[in-house]
């Protein structure tokens, strides 16, 4: 093996045969270091190439090439620190707005120092796609797309003007306007070219994204994953991310999916399988390999990769192959050049070649997958389609209930044109009130959308209808879907069942389901009814889809249409009729389910590479509302102190280009601010839902003169820290176990003198800060699961929380906590917040912080109100030396 001292990356530069493209040869580098590339997982090879290519820059060393090259000796089970330098960054408007606010605030700070603000400029290309703000206000109408687009523009005028300013102020940030599509689908269909040109070299496409579903790009052989705003900001400034070389779990796929089984059924099966895998895959790479991969289209692979965060993995990676190249060509891009490049780099997979070595290798026969749904509260809770009714009945039977059947008051159309007339109807347990074809997981898959359209066509031709009161919507991930559904003659049949295109964005999947008919909402709020939603999304956490809908089931787009017709989830659609035709005859699911041959033939007739090119060329200018939007200009943003959307954040007060690192301090006499349950999501910690007038953020905004009708959502106001701080732990379904029986942002405040009092978390945190009392949060298993929401770390940090003590952490949120200076501390095995018998009256000391090492120990002392105390050792989840530098 070559001595690292002798390694010069320039010596491995070659020219790709038949082209003028130069590249850094990974096989040549591997030969120099004695690395057997064939044994190294495909997902690690682009990372190894990036380390080797960057030796001598930003502290990257040849020793790190050696370290990752020896991965096969330990399969990721040893804590080896390596750098990852992403080639580009993607983000959406909710996560990207705070990032641009941070860059704008840094420019303002630099200007106050008398320096050129333009020195604050991202060094890595970043694309921000506006996709998270369109709401399903109006659905089921030919005017829905226009109405929702106009409402989106009006509600977000100030925020969109700020983003437009950012596009002209920062050379390396591109803003992709609203109504273009969902960031991950736009990335897959347009932004990704299969490779990058960096410093005049052809390199593998690598990225990070400020959204947990960034791994959807893994389907195209792109190494990338979701991070929070803190890590993304550093990457945009060209800094490598330091990470531990991961374990890589291989999933060998064999066989093919059976007739009538969809990619959605497959990904729900994989999600269940990997969540039940001993040890889990949190913080690990999952790599799909084997002959079965050849039987999955690129969009099917994208559906699987998209749900990596739901099964817990950092990535769900498919190596680049002929299918990847074919997809690039089918969507209007060059596929031959990337394929030649990946073959030259030994990064392309060919069926039949020996498998690399993995930390563990699992097998899945695609022929064993069955029609499935997941719910009612977690994406990993897969169930066979036939069990849907049984599972709903079990969920509805929980708790002390008195189920009601309510007659809903008939309703006329409203003057604003949002709600259609609603005749009198009964509302009971299991009734579906939302049926949404939504989310990048499935709307990026033409086969699934065409299947939904074919099912709608058959149902429509039979005279079947969706019951009144079911809010139906179709929100494709890009306008390309509208093009092929229209060409196939299927959009008209979806329209007939109420699945009109209502927006291009994340919509219902991120909680932007919009209001239900007022009489429906009133019935759900005032009576004991457990209603349901069915959606083709990737998450169904409680309170996420709609605050009044308690059960939510994930399923494929054609099944969403079928269940909308059925109108209730308390049914076995495999044996019971889902409705009647125009003559009153029973119709079963099998009668209208399209065959694989029908789907394939329709795709061949309506899919066209030219449509992809033209759609994006025509849409990148944005709708008229975007083109006509006035915005500031210049390198420095003119902050408006009265703005309720965009505020200069206080992090950069006293900003210096040479900020000294403070020593870490031990913590004494801390109080518990919140005690969380298992599976506390970032939605629980920092919700993005509609702002209720009686909530702390709502009351604050009203006090600032904002009208109740203009409160909008917490997601839209992420650029205003005054609002966001009042929302922390404020999800209406979140439970603070310090106060059993309560939900939302309330806690028990224990003053240094006097009796405890119940108050908002924001007010309690403010009082603790005034007293000089540190605070901690206790959690359970998988603390911080869900979206890569930086405010779920920013918020607690700004409230004064010094440490989160939990049984386990999800990867992205743990990294965000570190980036915000909040210690993630892990309880010993078999010790839980419940076994510690905590109630909030205790105080806590944390010692060993001042001498902390990566994955070191911190001593926790619990002082109880009765004078007793207890000590135990916690594991610091500061995993790397670079994380220790951040904290």
What does each of the following model-derived ranges do?
Residues 1-886:
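Fe-S-dependent hydro-lyases/dehydratases of central metabolism
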């Amino acid at each position: 093996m070559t001595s690292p001292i002798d390694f010069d990356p320039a010596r491995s530069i070659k020219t790709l045969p038949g082209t003028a493209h130069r590249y850094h040869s990974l096989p040549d580098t591997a030969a120099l270091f004695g690395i057997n590339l064939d044994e190294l997982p495909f997902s690690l090879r682009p990372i190894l190439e990036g380390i080797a290519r960057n030796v001598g820059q930003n502290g990257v060393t040849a020793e790190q090439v050696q370290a990752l090259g020896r991965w096969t000796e330990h399969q990721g089970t040893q804590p080896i620190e390596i750098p990852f330098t992403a080639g580009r960054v993607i983000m959406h408007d909710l996560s990207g707005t705070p990032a641009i606010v941070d860059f704008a605030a840094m420019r303002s700070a630099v200007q106050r120092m008398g320096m050129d603000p333009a020195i604050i400029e991202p060094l890595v290309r970043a694309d921000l796609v506006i996709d998270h703000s369109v709401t399903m206000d109006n659905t089921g109408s030919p005017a829905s797309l226009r109405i929702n687009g106009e409402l989106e523009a009006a509600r977000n005028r100030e925020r969109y003007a700020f983003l437009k300013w950012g596009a002209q102020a920062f050379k390396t940030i591109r803003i992709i306007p609203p109504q273009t599509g969902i960031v991950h689908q736009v990335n897959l269909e347009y932004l990704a070219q299969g490779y990058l040109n960096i410093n005049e070299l052809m390199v593998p496409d690598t990225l990070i994204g400020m959204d947990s579903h960034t791994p959807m790009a893994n389907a195209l052989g792109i190494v990338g994953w979701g991070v929070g705003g803190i890590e993304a900001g550093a990457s945009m400034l060209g800094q490598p991310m330091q990470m531990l070389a991961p374990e890589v779990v291989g999933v060998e796929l064999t066989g093919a999916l059976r007739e009538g089984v969809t990619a959605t059924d497959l990904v729900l099966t994989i999600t269940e399988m990997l969540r039940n895998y001993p040890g889990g895959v949190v913080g690990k790479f999952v790599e799909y390999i084997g002959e079965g991969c050849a039987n999955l289209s690129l969009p099917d692979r994208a559906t699987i990769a998209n749900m990596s965060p739901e099964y817990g993995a950092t990535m769900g990676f498919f190596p680049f192959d002929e299918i990847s190249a074919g997809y690039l060509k089918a969507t209007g891009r060059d596929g031959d050049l990337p394929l030649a490049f990946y073959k030259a780099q030994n990064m392309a997979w060919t069926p039949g070649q020996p498998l690399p070595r993995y930390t563990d290798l699992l097998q899945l026969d695609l022929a064993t997958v069955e029609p499935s749904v997941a719910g009612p509260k977690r994406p990993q809770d897969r169930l066979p389609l036939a069990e849907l009714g049984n599972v709903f009945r079990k969920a509805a039977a929980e708790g002390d209930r008195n189920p009601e059947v309510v007659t809903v008051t008939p309703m006329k159309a409203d003057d604003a044109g949002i709600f259609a007339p609603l005749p009198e109807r009964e509302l009971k347990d299991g009734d579906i009130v939302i049926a949404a074809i939504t989310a990048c997981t499935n709307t990026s898959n033409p086969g699934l959308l065409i299947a939904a359209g074919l099912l709608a066509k058959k149902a429509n031709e039979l005279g079947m209808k969706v019951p009144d009161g079911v809010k139906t919507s179709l929100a494709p991930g890009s306008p390309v879907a509208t093009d092929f559904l229209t060409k196939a003659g299927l959009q008209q049949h979806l329209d007939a069942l109420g699945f009109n295109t209502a927006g291009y964005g994340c919509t219902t999947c991120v909680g932007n389901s919009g209001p239900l008919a007022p009489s429906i909402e009133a019935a759900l709020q005032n009576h004991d009814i457990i209603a349901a939603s069915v959606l083709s999304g990737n998450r169904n956490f409680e309170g996420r889809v709609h605050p009044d809908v308690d059960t939510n089931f994930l399923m494929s787009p054609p099944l969403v249409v079928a269940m909308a017709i059925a109108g209730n989830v308390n049914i076995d659609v495999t044996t019971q009729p889902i409705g009647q035709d125009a003559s009153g005859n029973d119709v079963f699911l099998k009668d209208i389910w399209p065959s694989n041959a029908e789907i394939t033939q329709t795709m061949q007739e309506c899919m066209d590479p030219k449509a992809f090119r033209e759609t994006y060329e025509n849409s990148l200018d944005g709708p008229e509302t975007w083109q006509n939007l006035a915005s500031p200009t210049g390198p420095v943003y003119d902050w408006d102190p009265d703005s309720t959307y965009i505020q200069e954040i206080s992090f950069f007060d006293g900003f210096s280009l040479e900020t000294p690192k403070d020593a870490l301090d031990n913590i004494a006499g801390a109080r518990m601010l919140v005690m969380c349950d298992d599976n506390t999501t970032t939605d629980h910690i920092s919700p993005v839902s509609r702002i209720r007038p009686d909530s702390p953020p709502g009351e604050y905004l009203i006090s600032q003169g904002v009208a109740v009708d203009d409160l909008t959502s917490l997601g839209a106001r992420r650029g205003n820290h005054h609002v966001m701080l009042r929302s922390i732990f404020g999800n209406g379904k979140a439970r603070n176990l310090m106060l059993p029986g309560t939900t939302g942002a309330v806690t028990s405040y224990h003053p240094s003198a006097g009796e405890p009092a119940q108050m908002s978390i924001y007010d309690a945190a403010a009082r603790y800060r005034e007293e000089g009392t540190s605070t901690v949060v206790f959690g359970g298993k998988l603390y911080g699961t869900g979206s890569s929401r930086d405010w779920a770390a920013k918020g607690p940090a700004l409230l004064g929380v010094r440490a989160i003590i939990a049984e386990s952490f999800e990867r992205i949120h743990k990294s965000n906590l570190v980036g915000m200076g909040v210690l993630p501390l892990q309880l010993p095995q078999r010790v839980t917040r419940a076994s510690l018998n905590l109630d909030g009256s205790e105080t806590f000391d944390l010692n060993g912080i001042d001498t902390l090492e990566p994955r070191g120990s911190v001593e926790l002392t619990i002082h109880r109100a009765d004078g007793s105390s207890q000590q135990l050792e916690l594991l610091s989840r500061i995993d790397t030396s670079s994380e220790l530098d951040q904290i």
